[in-house]
UniProtKB/Swiss-Prot annotation:
This is Probable ATP-dependent RNA helicase DDX47. Keywords: Acetylation, Apoptosis, ATP-binding, Helicase, Hydrolase, mRNA processing, mRNA splicing, Nucleotide-binding, Nucleus, Phosphoprotein, RNA-binding, rRNA processing. Residues 55-226 form the Helicase ATP-binding domain. It holds the Pfam family Helicase_C. The keyword Glycosyltransferase does not apply. Interacts with AGO1 and AGO2. Interacts with GABARAP. Interacts with NOL8; the interaction is RNA-dependent. InterPro entries: DDX47/Rrp3_DEADc, DEAD/DEAH_box_helicase_dom, DEAD_box_RNA_helicase, Helicase_ATP-bd, Helicase_C-like, P-loop_NTPase, RNA-helicase_DEAD-box_CS, RNA_helicase_DEAD_Q_motif. Required for efficient ribosome biogenesis. May have a role in mRNA splicing. Involved in apoptosis. Expressed in skin, lung and breast. Also expressed in the brain. GO terms for cellular component: membrane; nucleolus; nucleoplasm; nucleus.
Length: 455
């Protein structure tokens, strides 16, 4: 990281936040009227805890360290002060937001443009997986806000003629702990060297790791720390369970759970791209409306999957940890940890996809004979023993034959998909990578399994 600029330690504005948010409005926080109206139009009826803490300090011109759990309203906490300042001193290339993933970058851009639609705010998303030339043209138009992943931004700073950030007024690092965990330290260091020192900096992170502390010392001046949650915890309205399963029956138990909790929306987390794709195909072959989201899909397909799930055109989203943090996915009823996370902290972020904004939700973790130690670490981290989810094992076993048949077709589809990729066939529109399972699915007798009467 860049050498520290002898900045002071963060001021502690991080006492447990007082429960006064019901009396606060965005106007009370100092947000200008036109942006308050935009908040109303987005359905933001009152500010969240992190917004109550961070916005007034940011409007005073302070650097901010925001420690907040997923789904806490972090984007509004930095977007509103930036737009407020932009109204006072209009300027192109006004703010840069660094984010670890492409999907999160697009979501942040959507929120900036929605909040700033009435004042003509323009943003550009600069991420990998998208044509560099079109991004260069977008940068040439000098948008007000740039939302970028560090690697692609460095590419443009080094190679796009005429592009620089020498007049930048605001830097935001969102999901800073994840940016650093993804080995973007070198890129962040380069960015810090080419932007003005006389700027405002907001650093938002779910956790205060040693790397984040080092980044704070290098990048922020006399920051104020706003902490919503200072320890690892899950929300009270989240019902958490586990199921102890022989490894070879994981697919069968998953189908059982989906039938038992039919009518809910599900996010199912898998550890690898391949297993995400395979499981999505398996479920599609059984008639479930499942869709995958993982890093080996093209950017358009990833966004397509996300949008179909958000629009409720699909009720089951299977994902790698790319979707466990940051993404704005409302109304997830059940999270299933099909593959247990190898890092205990990832459990918090995964199950944080449900029971958001005061709603209730369920999280079910599959534990095989190989996962016991990992599961015990999770229980130690959250400070509680999880109850078992009730299952009827005889009913589960009745599903094995049909699930085995669907597994066979899923493997077949996966092989065909791999061969198509090798032949470099044209992208099939906005179809997700499991659409091809439709023909195969009809070969699996009976389609989606119905619950037996009397249950």
């Amino acid at each position: 990281m860049a050498a520290p600029e002898e900045h002071d330690s963060p001021t502690e504005a991080s006492q447990p936040i007082v429960e006064e948010e019901e009396t606060k409005t965005f106007k009370d926080l100092g947000v200008t009227d036109v942006l308050c109206e935009a908040c109303d139009q987005l359905g933001w009826t009152k500010p969240t805890k992190i917004q109550i803490e961070a916005i007034p300090l940011a409007l005073q011109g302070r650097d901010i360290i925001g420690l907040a759990e997923t789904g806490s309203g972090k984007t509004g906490a930095f977007a509103l002060p930036i737009l407020n300042a932009l109204l006072e001193t209009p300027q192109r290339l006004f703010a840069l937001v660094l984010t670890p993933t492409r999907e999160l970058a697009f979501q942040i851009s959507e929120q900036f443009e929605a909040l700033g639609s009435s004042i003509g705010v323009q943003s550009a998303v600069i991420v990998g997986g998208i044509d560099s030339m079109s991004q260069s043209l977008a940068l040439a138009k000098k948008p007000h806000i740039i939302i970028a992943t560090p690697g692609r931004l460095i590419d443009h700073l080094e190679n796009t003629k005429g592009f620089n950030l020498r007049a930048l007024k605001y830097l935001v690092m969102d999901e800073a702990d994840r940016i650093l965990n993804m080995d973007f330290e070198t890129e962040v260091d380069k960015i810090l060297k080419v932007i003005p020192r006389d700027r405002k900096t907001f650093l938002f992170s779910a956790t205060m790791t040693k790397k984040v502390q080092k980044l704070q010392r290098a990048a922020l001046k006399n920051p104020v720390k706003c902490a919503v949650s200072s320890k690892y915890q899950t929300v009270e309205k989240l019902q958490q369970y586990y199921i102890f399963i022989p490894s070879k029956f994981k697919d069968t138990y998953l189908v059982y759970i989906l039938n038992e909790l039919a009518g809910n929306s599900f996010m199912i987390f898998c550890s690898t791209c391949n297993n995400t794709q395979r499981t999505a195909l398996l479920l599609r072959n059984l008639g479930f409306t499942a869709i995958p989201l993982h890093g080996q899909m093209s950017q358009s397909k990833r966004l397509g999957s996300l949008n179909k799930f958000k629009a409720k055109a699909r009720s089951i989203l299977l994902a790698t940890d790319v979707a466990s943090r940051g993404l704005d996915i409302p109304h997830v009823d059940v999270v299933v940890n099909f593959d247990i996370p190898t890092h205990s902290k990832d459990y918090i972020h995964r199950v944080g996809r449900t029971a958001r904004a005061g709603r209730s939700g369920k999280a079910i973790t599959f534990v095989t004979q190989y996962d016991v130690e990992l599961f015990q670490r999770i229980e130690h981290l959250i400070g509680k023993k999880l109850p078992g989810f009730p299952t009827q094992d005889d009913e589960v076993m009745m599903l094995t034959e049909r699930v085995a048949e669907a597994q066979r077709f899923a493997r077949m589809e996966l092989r065909e998909h791999g061969e198509k990729k090798k032949r470099s066939r044209e992208d099939a529109g906005d179809n997700d990578d499991t659409e091809g399972a439709i023909g195969v699915r009809n070969k699996v007798a009976g389609g989606k399994m119905k619950k037996r009467k009397g249950r």
